[in-house]
């Protein structure tokens, strides 16, 4: 999920992975899919010989010693009873649409490790200071095996759900169908419907599913009261969704197109994201990562309708670090060169993402609302003359906390007549409202994103798959 930056402020308006793109974006078997087919090797009867008994071996010949008494003809004429081979228990595999809980596919609780990169040598003059070491002590959760397990499980769910999305989403479907399909898949694999009080805080969507088309760069999701949009064969669609377990959010995004015209646009943004991942690390200045991203993206151009467009990095959205239950943690990674001296630090979690556009490369807020997010520093209770505001705030605290949510999620919980209360919370700065972000009409934009963990010994691209 892109973080809006301060440089600028509805929908359709007018280890070195390959950068090649296919007509429907980055398809392919997700990392760990073989494990989900095999049930991580722990299911089955354990015979390993398709029903052979005891020490019988396929192709083995048994002989009778000459000194042993030979059986009578009557004995030999009797038909020897053959034992029925044991039925082999078939390994579980993921269904389509994905509905098998991930814990059933990985009964040992061990999930695929993300792609790991060793750190390069530390640049002289950028070694950690004492204050940074103190900050690290307050966020050493990546040393906790349970946190790593939560992250890897959430990442595997993301891979399996996006694999289904890439294989099944086609023009002619509505954006509501697509969003609900993704979200139903995530909840099914988590084995948590999220309908009881507090369940959404245990696990669920990390933020509303983003389905931004063409000149809508980011922050669009179908919501009640809006006209539903039908996906067209000429559309370029950014698919951005998050999965959280115990507040640890995996944020990953990809772009789908159905026309090879846009292949170079997708390739540019994928290359820029992978360049950002390659350059990220402990003690690295964010400005250096930004400069590398810009250089990679601007080396591409795309021809549309006989006209050549440079691929421009979008200047007023950025990558970001992630805190527990907080998708935007405070640090930003712009896609253009800057003079910031802020560094990445050990123990931090980053969403490395890039957006590229054939338009201006900057955005304005569009019509409508994408979602809402409670201020992490907001009080536990609010005093408001509106009973609807007080009731809504209680619902937000019990079900979302500081996780970004949308109107669809409220109505799924059965919340009614909440708009006046929501407006009150927004106007008082307790809840932030997010609008769609638009580039110029007629332009096209793409996005790719991964979540990386800056562990002590390596950076782990936890959301990496065989697709992107």
Curated annotation (Swiss-Prot):
Substrate binds at residues 219, 328. It is found in: Cytoplasm. A divalent metal cation 1 binds at residues 240, 251, 449. Residues 1-10, 31-40 have a biased composition (Basic and acidic residues). One of its GO terms (biological process) is proteolysis. Residues 78-90 have a biased composition (Basic residues). Keywords: Aminopeptidase, Cytoplasm, Hydrolase, Metal-binding, Protease. Residues 1-106 are annotated as: Disordered. It catalyses: Release of N-terminal amino acids, preferentially methionine, from peptides and arylamides. GO terms for molecular function: initiator methionyl aminopeptidase activity; metal ion binding; metalloaminopeptidase activity. GO terms for cellular component: cytoplasm. Its EC number is 3.4.11.18. Its cofactor is Co(2+); Zn(2+); Mn(2+); Fe(2+). PANTHER family: METHIONINE AMINOPEPTIDASE 2, METHIONINE AMINOPEPTIDASE 2-2. Belongs to the peptidase M24A family. Methionine aminopeptidase eukaryotic type 2 subfamily. Cotranslationally removes the N-terminal methionine from nascent proteins. The N-terminal methionine is often cleaved when the second residue in the primary sequence is small and uncharged (Met-Ala-, Cys, Gly, Pro, Ser, Thr, or Val). This is Methionine aminopeptidase 2.
């Amino acid at each position: 999920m892109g973080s809006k930056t301060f440089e600028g402020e509805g929908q359709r308006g007018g280890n070195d992975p390959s950068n090649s793109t296919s007509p429907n974006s980055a398809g392919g078997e997700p990392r760990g899919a073989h494990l989900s087919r095999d049930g991580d090797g722990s299911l089955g009867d354990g015979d390993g010989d398709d029903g052979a008994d005891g020490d019988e071996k396929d192709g083995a010949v048994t002989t009778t010693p000459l000194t042993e008494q030979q059986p009578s003809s009557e004995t030999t004429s009797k038909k020897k009873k053959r034992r029925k081979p044991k039925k082999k228990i078939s390994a579980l595999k993921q269904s389509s649409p994905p509905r098998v809980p991930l814990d059933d596919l990985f009964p040992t609780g061990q999930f695929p490790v993300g792609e790991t990169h060793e750190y390069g040598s530390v640049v002289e003059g950028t070694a950690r200071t004492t204050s940074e070491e103190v900050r690290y002590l307050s966020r050493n959760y990546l040393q906790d095996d349970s946190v790593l397990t939560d992250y890897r499980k959430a990442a595997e769910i993301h891979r399996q759900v996006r694999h289904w999305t890439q294989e099944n989403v086609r023009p002619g479907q509505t954006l509501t169908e697509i969003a609900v399909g993704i979200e139903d898949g995530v909840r099914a694999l988590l084995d948590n419907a999220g309908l009881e009080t507090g369940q959404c805080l245990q696990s669920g969507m990390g933020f509303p599913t983003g389905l931004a088309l063409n000149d809508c760069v980011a922050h669009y999701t179908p919501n009640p009261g809006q006209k539903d949009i039908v996906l067209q064969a000429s559309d370029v669609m950014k698919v951005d969704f998050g999965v959280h377990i115990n507040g640890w959010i995996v944020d990953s995004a990809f772009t789908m197109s159905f026309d090879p015209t846009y292949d170079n646009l997708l390739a540019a943004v994928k290359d820029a994201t992978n360049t950002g991942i390659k350059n990220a690390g402990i003690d690295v200045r964010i400005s250096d990562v930004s400069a590398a991203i810009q250089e990679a993206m601007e080396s591409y151009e795309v021809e549309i309708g006989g006209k050549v467009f440079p691929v421009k990095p979008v200047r007023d959205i950025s990558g970001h670090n992630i805190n527990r239950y907080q998708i935007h943690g405070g640090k930003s990674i712009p896609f253009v060169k800057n003079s910031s001296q802020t560094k990445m630090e050990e123990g931090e979690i980053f969403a490395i993402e890039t957006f590229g556009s054939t338009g201006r490369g900057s955005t304005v807020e569009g019509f409508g609302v994408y979602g809402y997010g409670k201020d992490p520093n907001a009080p536990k209770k609010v005093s408001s003359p509106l009973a609807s505001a007080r009731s809504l705030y209680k619902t937000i605290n019990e079900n979302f906390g500081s996780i970004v949510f949308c109107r669809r999620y409220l109505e799924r919980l059965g919340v009614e007549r909440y708009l006046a209360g929501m407006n009150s919370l927004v106007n008082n700065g307790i809840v932030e409202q997010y609008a769609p972000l638009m580039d110029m009409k007629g332009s096209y934009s793409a996005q790719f994103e991964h979540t990386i963990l800056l562990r002590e010994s390596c950076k782990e691209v936890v959301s990496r798959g065989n697709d992107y």
